[in-house]
Each structure stands twice: as structure tokens, then as C-alpha cells.
Amino acid sequence: MSKAPVRVAVTGAAGQIGYSLLFRIASGEMLGKDQPVILQLLDLPQAQKAVKGVMMELEDCAFPLLAGMIATDDPNVAFKDAKVALLVGARPRGPGMERKDLLTENAKIFTVQGAAIGQYADPDCKVLVVGNPCNTNAYIAKEVAQKYGRVPAKNFTGMLRLDHNRALSQLAGKSGREVSSLKNLVVWGNHSPTMYADYRFVKSNGDSVKDLINDAAWNKDVFLPTVGKRGAAIIEARGLSSAASAANAAIDHIRDWVLGSNGEWVTMGIPSDGSYGIPEGVIYGFPVTTENGEYKIVQGLEIDEFSRERMTVTLNELLEEREGVKDLLA
């Protein structure tokens, strides 16, 4: 018997990332090749015409798994009964805009969306925030949604998978190993240049990649800055931000969360439970394994002095961001 369709809400549906994302969701890449979907597309009133154009293209693909679509500028409609919500739309940073202004502008958006999810989404809705600053935007949505007592805090996540995939690619290039052979990468912290991609545990066909590379200076001076500033490098080269790679990471994040990571470590920005000394509730990148729609933090990893230093720097940035929006959540 065929499965009942799953409602997937996508915000910023007319944007660059949305355009790279929607066709892959409709083709079954995210939830499986046997899972029909209904797309519930949210964007601003002035973007509705563009969303209609994207819907026309989706129709023209004749995807067997696309069971329906709606477009709306009302979050309450977009999130109604959604089992998966991809919060892609966010206010981009404009010229001369301070980071704190960006936080304030986005806090308004994610307060509204958190409330709509809290009231109208499926009680087990899995939420991924892609729009930056994604950890703090996810924190805002989570905090607001908790007021309604329906969707649990653990279901609100931020996207660290793009950093994870970027780091894998750099490690494959440096070690000369195939990217698919690399296991046990960790990305700690905030999705920002402070993130800490930690390859001390990475194995390739049983070999330690840290030993293969054996270059502490490369780690500190080349690898971490390259991964941390990759987004800026892409804007510099392309004139536009990374959209296809961000969409790809979102697909990876949800697919592994819903369908399981088969024992492999993946990175998700999740509300901390206090593990590794990270204060509870902060949305922080952790290594997790996923099974039956649940994630579990990989425990017992040794944290050396350099790692603790880097983990603290990225934590402090998150605490500062949280401080910057706390009045808006009062």
C-alpha cells in the first residue's frame, strides 16, 4: 500500500536555496523514493508571483511523489500539519548592517514562525533552520514554540551539515582519500567562521586521517579558516551566496534524521543537553547518530586543550547572540 503524503513546509520558497531544494524534495531525495510529499510554500506577499512560477516548473517535472502544493504568505497556513519544516527564508545582511541589526531583524521573522509551528504544525514536526544566523534563529523559533507545549524543543535544529560537508571535501583533498571513505568527522558549535571542524577521530578504511595528514599547522592555518570562510569565498567568486550546496546539506540533514544515519556520525545543530560542558538549550553543533527519527549525541569523546579552546570561542559567540535577542523573547 502506498504511504500517506507528508506535508513539507519550506520558507523562502522563491529564493535561490529554495529553487535548488524543492525539486530534490519532490523527487524523493529527502524522505525516500516511496514517500509522497505535499509542498507548503511560504514567502513574502511580493514574492508570490515568483513562487507560482516555481510551482509551474514543479508541475512540469511530473514528479510521481508530488501529491500537492500550496503557496501562501501566511505562516499559519504554511505550517499547518507540517511534519517537516525547512526554514530557509531569512533577512540577508545588507551593506553597512551590523550583525546585531541582522539578529534583531531575523528575530522578528523567527518569532512569528516559531509561534506558527508551535500552534499549527504536526506535534512531531522536524524543524531545520537554514536561514542565518541559523543557530540563533533556531533558538528563537524553539523558545517561542515551547509556549504552546506541542512541538518538543529537541525538534528544532540548525544546519551545520554544510560546514560538515565542506570539511569532508577539504580532508579528502588533503589526505588523497575518497570522500565517501571518511567517517567520524565532528563540527562543533555555531554555523559561522568560529565553527570548529574536528578531524581527530576521522577514519578512512581504518586509517587515522589525522595521522595521514600529520600537519598541525595546516589544521590551524589552512583547514579551519578555509572551511569557516568558505561561504564568503563563494560569494566573492560567484557574486551570489552558496545556494545549491546549502540545499544539498539541508537534504542530507533531514534525510539522515528521518531515515537514519546507519550508525555514521553526522553533525546537527541541536539544543544542548549539557553534553561536553555546553550549557543546556543552546543550539550547538554536535556529532550525532540518528535512528527511527531520533538523534543521539556521540558521547565520551576526549576533548584536548586546542579543541576546548575552539569549542569555547564558538560557544561564546552563541551566548553573545542569545544575549542579543533575549529582550525580544521576553
From Swiss-Prot:
Q: Does the keyword Protein transport apply?
A: no
Pfam families membership: Ldh_1_C, Ldh_1_N
| Positions contributing to NAD(+) binding | 12-18, 106, 113, 130-132
Which EC class does it fall in?
oxidoreductase
Kindly state which reaction or reactions the protein catalyses. (S)-malate + NAD(+) = oxaloacetate + NADH + H(+)
Disulfide bonding pattern of the chain: none
For this protein, the record's InterPro entries field holds: L-lactate/malate_DH, Lactate/malate_DH_C, Lactate/malate_DH_N, Lactate_DH/Glyco_Ohase_4_C, Malate_DH_type2, NAD(P)-bd_dom_sf
Which residues are involved in binding substrate? Answer: 93, 99, 132, 166
Keyword field: NAD, Oxidoreductase, Tricarboxylic acid cycle
Q: Which GO terms describe its molecular function?
A: L-malate dehydrogenase (NAD+) activity
What EC designation does it have? Answer: 1.1.1.37
Q: Please give the biological process terms from Gene Ontology that the record holds.
A: malate metabolic process; tricarboxylic acid cycle
Function as written in the Swiss-Prot or TrEMBL entry: Catalyzes the reversible oxidation of malate to oxaloacetate.
What family is reported?
Answer: Belongs to the LDH/MDH superfamily. MDH type 2 family.
Which HAMAP family does this one have?
Malate_dehydrog_2
Q: What is this protein called?
A: Malate dehydrogenase
Species per Swiss-Prot/TrEMBL record: Azoarcus sp. (strain BH72)
UniProt gene name = mdh
